[in-house]
């Protein structure tokens, strides 16, 4: 157990702060701030975690196993971390050293785990190679001490004497009691945790908590006389049979191994380096700079290999790097001077010493003495399995040893490990993969459960006939070669039990070929150096000490007969076979297997590891690669096999200056490499890609990602064709029928895109029609941004002169189709394969509901980018231009859209746009709304009394406000972290000089920023100068106007609109605005300042057409405006507030002189001559919108004038009173004549209440009505009238029906209304809320009627029902209704009051 000590306050920063500016640019956010927040979070987690030596994690294999659940998106691979002493804690990405407890969370791209370990805890005992109990991942329990105990058996026959030897038992094995070990016959040797049986001489080490010494003794040395004297045969058999792994293996298999490691395993983090062999180090110098002053032989001799960068070399053992070599340098001396603790150097030194230093043995010499050959048998109970024999007695034995040496030489040669994955170039060969462990799972042939395995477990379980299955290019060959290499190198004791290992490729064999012939052809230098008889004798003698690694297996009938017999009759030969087979070829071999090893998807961190090794000279490209796939997590899965990594490498090597690194580049390169590899069968490949593309396309549009044999047959896919398996995977586990998937969902989309282009580009009409049919299935703009985004990105990147215009036309017409705009359905099957799309679609739906215009603008620009990318990629810009120009007509785009090449090639298209939107956002904190003022709006004496069952209908305001503040803080933190890079004005339209065509209207939207920097000022000057008209929208940005004075003064004639909200202008800023000669619109709101210079000088704005003033407090603008201002004849929009104490004559005169007025809003508490106001408004024949607020309204003169407003579209009389029934009746009849009315917000009062049914009946004449609101004016009869009018054909375009605070409607009235309401096909929002003092405790029948009603409203997305008290059953019923509703993904039910007090709970 780990020592339970609290973590110290050690602060660790893994970030390289010099790289943070570069990361900021790549991430699009403030990396410095992000790093600070991450470090704070990590420090909090670090403080919670326990420290102290963790004996449970001293085994590297166990540490490696903890990374099974590690996040694949990482720059570090598990082997590097485990070898550096770390295990995965499971807390975020945290890893911890078993020895010094260092906790790291980050995985740097430029530094390895061992480097960060040395950097933060250089005094860690593990790093200093102290005896801290580390167990190397390939180490074994059986030890081979060629010594015997001093005094022989007699001295330790007594348990007490054995126990006394444990007085210095290491601290890291305190979980194993010396009493139990001594009882089992063991004596402590004094070396690490190795013990030796006093009777049989067997040595065991690497003890871990939970080990049973008797079981270990029985497993490894079952013939021990002492063991047999203490345990029965049945007990010994039970111990052996219950042992996990190492079937039929005893200690003698390891003790008598012919394979000996040439190098020590002192440095755990490099114990399987391929560069442990000098020949392989030499081979790494093939690209060594010729001008270098140092010879490669000397460098390789000193343990150094070439990194491929400049003249930098690295030690395979200690990992140290050396560079800048000069004439006369001695690599060995420099290595020794810089890295004196290097295990490789220490081993060289100890090997050179003739006489061992006896003093260094200490206590070990007292316990052990060297065993001579004459008395060796006295320490080993049973002789070796393969005894040394005279050559005449056993010729096979000598031949076997010779064969062992030849095989080891073959497997450690550079040629063996160097094989190009795609047979195109040698840039990415198998040797670059040997350091990356594959992700492997084991499954018993009769059990569905898979168990993830790490390599040490795989090696321990090798037995009889096993297969490793995986997709094409999944790394099967790499795994087999790695096993052969590790065996030959001697650095994997787990494999030392095999005396011979044969790696044989079955792809180049003949059925009648003999085993010796195959071995000679593939592995041995001399033909005929081993005979068939010799091989047969060796196998018969060695049995399970022979391992066959059989690669490229296809089917049993196609392999050599001799190999077939080894598989089919393995019970006779008892050899071990590991057979590599593609998943689709494994069926006929399964009958001979008990265990299958399955290679899973290639982890993303392996991809990063390989790219880091090969392209460490271009870290910027690697960082971009990491950032891209970090932002697009679903695309990480495309690196499914090493073949895709090979495709990336081939592309990067071939195009070193091509910046592309995304999924499109990966897939294109992969297909290109397949094409090059299969030149001889180009037509077959083409047909395979086409048929698989057909399957992919059909599956994509039907949200199908798994296919059966029938699906493949229908699409013409041949599953037996090897090329098919380069595109698809076959799965057979626990299925009556196999099923197939493409290598990844994204790859399926890519192939589907290729097929769509092929169909549209075909000369056959039926193919073109089929392509258009598929294309038209893309009928939702939202899906183009979300679910179809990747697919369309692939389509747009594939060139096609015929398909280009068709695709462009379809995409650009999507946004003009209202039905398609609202067709935003979501397919759950698709989301199973891309769950991250779900959140994206929720955000898009929210944007669509809250701000349809912003949604529409975003989708429009997205489609434009896709369309133009398609046009340019297919070289069909001229043919596509008519569609593009039609699309641009009257549209608003963002400033970034002008960077598109199209606006450079066709700048005249700018004139078609309505405007360009340029947002500028700062980091100021917007004023937070204070809800405490609402407490004064509620009468606390009216606190509702409710049952406990209905408590969920209310939420305390303080709790709600606290949650809201927390969310606002999170949003602010995120927004503050966003890096607001200045717009790029170097491409597209901005390359034009001079700019003959200008931006028709520039909308500058400024929020939360006071002052801009010089860079932004220069950008504004450039953009302003390229704009015909400029509109400024300023919010909470005091001082902004002054900071952009140079830009405004250069373009003041272009500014036509200025909107000022929540800020006070300085005197200088007001003076600057007054110099704008072309200002047509002025809006001022959200401030208590009257802008003391602007309003008295409004007459300076000679072109002013729109004036909107909404000031806080009792401020009357018309009291300060100049007398000349009302004489203007061009006001079109007037939104104003005045106070009672001022003469309204200026306002009346202004209206009189504004015949073009079309929007009029007035807020006033008293108007002395309302009749004259209405008379003047009647003269405004173009008036389309009227809104009256506050208490100045007079019903009689208004109704008298109302028939004259024949163009009226919006009438808002919210809060106005109609007490007179006669006037209200006239009002009702007149409403029926306003045929253009779209929004009707009705007044209140007794008069309206009495004529409500008449008003509703008159609404049948209002065919354009979209919004209808009744407030305090309905009862049971009138509300049911709404349903009757709807049934008879009224309200067909109604989208919003507001029926709130109508307390005279009873529950029965609502129920009747719900039961009758139907035929409102466009209703999106229904409000039936009540005041909290007028709650309705709904009966089950009412809730049921409501649910049925909502189901009849197919487009309803919001239901407001405050003060409806619903119990758990009612809520459950509504939830069931939501799931069944056509808008189930969008329908929101608002049922909870937010109050400054809690209701009284009635018990």
Curated annotation (Swiss-Prot):
CDD domains: BIR (cd00022). ATP binds at residues 473-478. Pfam families: BIR, NACHT, Nlrc4-like_WHD, NLRC4_HD. Residues 464-758 form the NACHT domain. InterPro entries: AAA+_ATPase, BIR_rpt, LRR_dom_sf, NACHT_NTPase, Naip, Nlrc4-like_WHD, NLRC4_HD, P-loop_NTPase. Coiled coil: none annotated. SUPFAM superfamilies: Inhibitor of apoptosis (IAP) repeat (SSF57924), P-loop containing nucleoside triphosphate hydrolases (SSF52540), RNI-like (SSF52047). GO terms for biological process: apoptotic process; defense response to bacterium; detection of bacterium; icosanoid biosynthetic process; innate immune response; negative regulation of apoptotic process; negative regulation of neuron apoptotic process; negative regulation of tumor necrosis factor-mediated signaling pathway. Keywords: Apoptosis, ATP-binding, Immunity, Inflammatory response, Innate immunity, Metal-binding, Nucleotide-binding, Protease inhibitor, Repeat, Thiol protease inhibitor, Zinc. Zn(2+) binds at residues 315, 318, 335, 342. It comes from the Eukaryota. The keyword Nucleotide-binding applies. The keyword Repeat applies. SMART domains: AAA, BIR. Both the BIR and NACHT domains are essential for effective inhibition of pro-CASP9 cleavage. BIR3 domain binds to procaspase-9 and the NACHT domain interacts with the NACHT domain of APAF1 forming a bridge between pro-CASP9 and APAF1. PANTHER family: BACULOVIRAL IAP REPEAT-CONTAINING PROTEIN 1. Anti-apoptotic protein which acts by inhibiting the activities of CASP3, CASP7 and CASP9. Can inhibit the autocleavage of pro-CASP9 and cleavage of pro-CASP3 by CASP9. Capable of inhibiting CASP9 autoproteolysis at 'Asp-315' and decreasing the rate of auto proteolysis at 'Asp-330'. Acts as a mediator of neuronal survival in pathological conditions. Prevents motor-neuron apoptosis induced by a variety of signals. Interacts (via NACHT domain) with APAF1 (via CARD and NACHT domains). Interacts with C.violaceum needle protein CprI. This is Baculoviral IAP repeat-containing protein 1. It comes from Homo sapiens (Human). The gene is NAIP.
